[in-house]
Amino acid sequence: MKKYKEIAVKAKYIVVLYDNNAVEVYVKQKVTIAILHKIAGENGLKFHQDTAVENGIEWFAKKILDTLGDPNAIVGGEDCFYINKNNTLICGNRYAGTVKEALRKIAEEFEIDYQDTWNTQQFGRKIINELK
């Protein structure tokens, strides 16, 4: 799990700006208990499968966040999840290509102006600001 500064979510994209100014892009996926178990395991947590099923997916996500000490998001692995300001649980899988490729794709899809000379950090900050 990495420390993040900002997260922007729009359409199928989740864009994360980390404390060290690195940027990562995830693509939304269906939230499942299996994905949450995988994320929990990647962060050294183990939960019994039945406990998660009995209490529901939202409870399970919140339990993982509370245990790891972040009230809103787990980012930095192959998968991520985030609870937005409307209390909606959003799950994503790391974009398969490069970060810059993902940022270009987002910029083109949402008609965001950018410069080819920007580094990933500059580009990522611009995308996050535009998606908010």
Regions found by a protein language model. Give the residues of each.
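Short acidic DE-rich linear segments
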Residues: 131-132
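Extreme N-terminal leader/activation tails
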Residues: 2-12, 35, 40-41
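Acidic, low-complexity, intrinsically disordered interaction modules
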Residues: 17-122
